[in-house]
Amino acid sequence: MKEFLDKYDTVIFDLDGVITSEQCYWDAAALTVWEYLHSDTYIGTEKLDIAPFNDTYKQIRAKVFCDDKVIYALKGKGVNSNWDLAYITILVSMLNDEYDFNRVLEYAENMSDNVLDEYEILAKHTAENCGGQLEDYLRNGIIWKTIQNCFQEWFLGDEIYAEVYGKEPLVKGKKGLVYKEKPVIEIEAVRSVIKGLSQTKRLCTATGRIFSEMDKPLSEWGIKQYFSTDGLCNYDYVVKAENKLGKTLTKPHPYMFLKALYGTDYDDEKILNGDYDKSKIEKVLVGGDAGADILAAKAMGADFCAVLTGVSGQAARGYFEGLNAEYILNSIADFE
């Protein structure tokens, strides 16, 4: 392991773009946007035949996200959850009489850097434009939850969706993009790095994935045993804490990194009130690929290691340099 790692006793990893690939999530987000806007199951007028979309999703993604420019823009603003990626794209689309995704790109590029405030601003604009109650449009409101459910159907597919949620999908016929998942670098390199780090450090996750979607690749790739059992912070904890405390706690809020560091059984109110041993943070390294990761790490007070395996690849180097990342690596393979 590289010498710079010696000063840390805890390493917290984001997963997507660092260990796991986000490609399948972006495909699912694009399909969700398209179905929600066009299908009469949601707000559209068409009776969509779902089957062809299982094979043509790349073309849909290119159109919805303007050859991924929308993804780059929103991720650069700190949008972490891919449910939020779909949600923002849909709400901005609803502001226009015709669904012009170039308008979505323009909106995304002009958003402020405080993305946590942007959600409510967008919800208000869309509610005023389309009618209805503001609370329906808010993040975690009924529209957001409907979008989330549609997303999960595409990502998990009919069979796994039914297993995870204990009910049949609203729209059947989705094969599941989860079966196409791959690590962001060669799996042998991932295993070597994670196993090596675990010899001397507590390894944690802070991921926008729910437990089942985090657990599947970590288990199947043979690396879950190297992570601390009370350090596997996933999006289920965010949902639970947000519902309890009434605050937005997704990254770039530091909640997830703090929850991983102090243990997933650590009290959420204590985390929000700063009631924890802050001296531990000095020996924490956060590994991530996105703006939301470094902003959350800096808010926490932890050192940050950027890896250039995320949405922007090598082009993200200047961004991370501008935010004073302590380390910038091509991938986690460079830990060795």
Please give the residue ranges for each predicted region.
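Active-site neighborhood of HAD-like aspartate-dependent phosphohydrolases
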Residues: 1-66, 84-87
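Phosphate/oxyanion-binding active-site loops and adjacent basic polyanion-contact surfaces
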Residues: 21-25, 78-82, 186, 249-257
